[in-house]
Curated annotation (Swiss-Prot):
Biased composition (Polar residues): 179-194
Species this protein is from: Mus musculus (Mouse)
Cellular location(s): Cytoplasm
Protein's name according to its UniProt entry: Syntaxin-binding protein 4
Coiled coil residues, start to end: 298-408
Region (Disordered): 142-214
Residue positions, PTM Phosphoserine: S10, S12, S99, S216, S467
Domain of life the protein comes from: Eukaryota
Length: 557
C-alpha cells in the first residue's frame, strides 16, 4: 500500500514538518489501534497511539508505530479533543465502510523503553490503553524532541527500560543535575544563554513534580508556532505576521520563550476559549510537555516482561520460519535457475527449429519454383513435340505420296523391264532368222553358176535349212521367188517385233479365265485392245496395197 498524499490545508509549519505524514490504509477488518491522551487526560492534550493491535489494518500496513501522534482520521481533527471524542471519531470512521482509512500523524522518535510506552507523567491507565505514556514537548518538532537528562538517577529497574530510567527523578533527591535544553537547529554560538541559566527547573511540591521552561530560553519561531497547532490553534496569515512583528527574532531566527507566551496570550485568547483552554492554562500546557516518567509499578513491569518474553519467543519462531523461508527461497532460486536454463535451452531449440523451418520454407519455395520451371519446360516440350508431330504428319503425307509415286514408277519400270526382256528375245529370234536367210541367199547367189544337178542338191539343202519352200518349189522364177520369200520373212519378223512392242507403261496380263488384257501403269487403267493394234493394221494394209501391183507386173517382165 502506497502512502497517501497530504490533503489540502492552509500553509503552516505543520505542513512543512518532515515528520508530518498522511497515509491511506485499505479498510478490511478494523483500524486496530489503542489510543491514549486527550485534553481531559493527564497524558494529553494530544492523542497518541498506545498499541498497534496485530491483525488490524494498521498492523498489516506497518507504517504506524506506537508513540505516533494522531493529527486526523478521515479528515476529522484529533487535536484539541477529549479521549472520548477521539474514540467516537474512530467509531464513526469504522461505520464508513466505503472509504479507506486516511490517517494524518506525526512520527515521534523518542521512546521510553518499550515501543508501546512513551514518557508519561503518571502510571494511570486509560480506558482502552495499557500504562499511560507521557506526551512530547510542544516547543520542538517531533523529530527534534528535547528530553532532559539526569546524572544522579540510579539504575535500579530492569534493563528493558534504560531510556526511561535515564530520565526518572526521585523525590528523595534534593538536587538534580540537569543539562540545558537547546534547539537542535541552533548553532553552538546560540547556547551561551543556556549555559548561564538552566533551561528548566524542578518543582517537587507534589508527588508529580512539574518542570517549567526558563522564559529566557530562545527557540525557533517555527517550533513555537507548531506548538500552537498542537493546541488546535490555526493562526491566519495576518495573525502569524503580527506575532512575528511583536516577538523580536535574532539573526538566527530564534525568539524568547517568555515573550512568545505573552504575545500568544494576547493574540489567541478567543481561540483558546473555543478549544476550552483558558489563558491561565497556556503555561501549564506548555510546561507539561517535558515531564519525566515516573517509575512503573511492579505488576506492569512483570506484564511487560511477559510481553517481552512472548515477543522473544515469537521472534525465535519467526527466525526459524525465516530460516525455513530462506532455505525454501534458495531452493526456489535453484529451481528458478534450472527453469531459466531449461527455458534458455528451449529458447535455443526454438530458435534452431525456427531457423530450420525458415530453411525448409526456403527450400520448399525453391522446389516449388523449380517445379514451376519444370512444368513450364514440360509445356514447352509438349508444344514442340506437338509441332514436330504435325510436321511429321505433313512429312509422312508427303512421304506417302512420294512412296506411291515411287511405287508407280517401280511398277512402270518393272513392266518396261519385262517388255525389254521379251523384246530382246524377239529381236534375238528375228536376228537369227534374218542371219540364216541372208546366209542362204548368199550361198544361193554364189552357187547360181554351178551345174544344174549340183544346184538342185544345194537348193534342197538350203530349203531344208532355211525353210524356203517357195524357193524350192519354183525353181524357174528364182528371183521372183526369192523376193517373195524375203517379203514374207520381213513380214513375219515385223509381226514378231510389233506384236510385243507396247507403249511406255503398258503391260499385257491375263484374267483367271485366260483372257488377255492390257494394263496402263501410268494412268492405272486397263484395256482389252492392244494399244497399237489399229496403227499396225493400217500399216499392214498400206504395205499390201503397195505389193499387189508389183507382183502383177513381175510376170510380164
Amino acid at each position: 500500500m502506497s502512502d497517501g498524499t497530504a490533503s489540502a490545508r492552509s500553509s503552516s509549519p505543520l505542513d512543512r514538518d518532515p515528520a508530518f505524514r498522511v497515509i491511506t490504509v485499505t479498510k478490511e477488518t478494523g483500524l486496530g489501534l489503542k489510543i491514549l491522551g486527550g485534553i481531559n487526560r493527564n497524558e494529553g492534550p494530544l492523542v497518541y497511539i498506545h498499541e498497534v493491535i496485530p491483525g488490524g489494518d494498521c498492523y498489516k500496513d506497518g507504517r504506524l508505530k506506537p508513540g505516533d501522534q494522531l493529527v486526523s482520521i478521515n479528515k476529522e481533527s484529533m487535536i484539541g479533543v477529549s479521549f472520548e471524542e477521539a474514540k467516537s471519531i474512530i467509531t464513526r470512521a469504522k461505520l464508513r465502510s466505503e472509504s479507506p482509512w486516511e490517517i494524518a500523524f506525526i512520527r515521534q522518535k523518542s521512546y521510553c523503553g518499550h515501543p508501546g510506552n512513551i514518557c508519561c507523567p503518571s502510571p494511570q491507565v486509560s480506558e482502552d490503553c495499557g500504562p499511560q505514556t507521557s506526551t512530547f514537548t510542544l516547543l520542538s518538532s517531533p523529530s527534534e524532541t528535547l528530553l532532559p537528562k539526569t546524572s544522579s538517577t540510579p539504575q535500579t529497574q530492569d534493563s528493558t527500560f534504560p531510556s526511561c530510567k535515564a530520565i526518572q527523578t526521585k523525590p528523595e533527591h534534593d538536587k538534580t543535575e540537569h543539562s540545558p535544553i537547546t534547539s537542535l537547529d541552533n548553532s553552538p554560538a546560540d547556547t551561551s544563554n543556556a549555559d548561564i541559566a538552566p533551561a528548566w527547573t524542578d518543582d517537587d511540591s507534589g508527588p508529580q513534580g512539574k518542570i517549567s521552561l526558563n522564559p529566557s530560553v530562545r527557540l525557533k519561531a517555527e517550533k513555537l508556532e507548531m506548538a500552537l497547532n498542537y493546541l488546535g490553534i490555526q493562526p491566519t496569515k495576518e495573525q502569524r505576521e503580527a506575532l512575528r512583528e511583536q516577538v523580536q527574532a535574532d539573526s538566527k531566527g530564534t525568539v524568547s520563550f517568555g515573550d512568545f507566551v505573552q504575545v500568544a496570550r494576547s493574540l489567541f485568547c478567543l481561540q483558546l476559549d473555543e478549544v476550552n483552554v483558558g489563558v491561565h492554562e497556556i503555561p501549564s500546557i506548555l510546561d507539561s510537555q517535558l515531564l519525566p516518567c515516573d517509575s512503573l509499578e511492579a505488576d506492569e513491569v512483570g506484564k511487560l516482561r511477559q510481553e517481552r518474553n512472548a515477543a522473544l519467543e515469537e521472534r525465535n519462531v519467526l527466525k526459524e520460519k525465516l530460516l525455513e523461508s530462506e532455505k525454501h527461497r534458495k531452493q526456489l532460486i535453484e529451481e528458478l535457475q534450472n527453469v531459466k536454463q531449461e527455458a534458455k535451452a528451449v529458447a535455443e531449440e526454438t530458435r534452431a527449429l525456427r531457423s530450420r523451418i525458415h530453411l525448409a520454407e526456403a527450400a520448399q519455395r525453391q522446389a516449388h519454383g523449380m517445379e514451376m520451371d519444370y512444368e513450364e519446360v514440360i509445356r514447352l516440350l509438349e508444344a514442340e513435340v506437338s509441332e514436330l508431330k504435325a510436321q511429321l504428319a505433313d512429312y509422312s503425307d508427303q512421304n506417302k505420296e512420294s512412296v506411291q509415286d515411287l511405287r508407280k514408277r517401280v511398277t512402270v519400270l518393272d513392266c518396261q523391264l519385262r517388255k525389254s526382256e521379251m523384246a530382246r528375245k524377239a529381236f534375238k529370234a528375228s536376228t537369227e532368222r534374218l542371219l540364216g536367210f541372208i546366209e542362204a541367199i548368199q550361198e544361193v547367189l554364189l552357187d547360181s553358176s554351178a551345174p544344174l544337178s549340183t544346184l538342185s542338191e544345194r537348193r534342197a539343202v538350203l530349203a531344208s535349212q532355211t525353210s524356203l519352200p517357195l524357193l524350192a518349189r519354183n525353181g524357174r522364177s528364182f528371183p521372183a521367188t526369192l523376193l517373195l520369200e524375203s517379203k514374207e520373212l520381213v513380214r513375219s519378223v515385223r509381226a514378231i517385233l510389233d506384236m510385243d512392242c507396247l507403249p511406255y507403261g503398258w503391260e499385257e496380263a491375263y484374267t483367271a479365265d485366260g483372257i488377255k488384257y492390257f494394263i496402263n501403269h501410268v494412268t492405272q487403267t486397263t484395256s482389252w485392245i492392244h494399244p497399237v493394234m489399229s496403227a499396225l493394221n493400217l500399216s499392214c494394209a498400206e504395205e499390201s496395197e503397195e505389193d499387189c501391183p508389183r507382183e502383177l507386173t513381175d510376170p510380164k517382165s
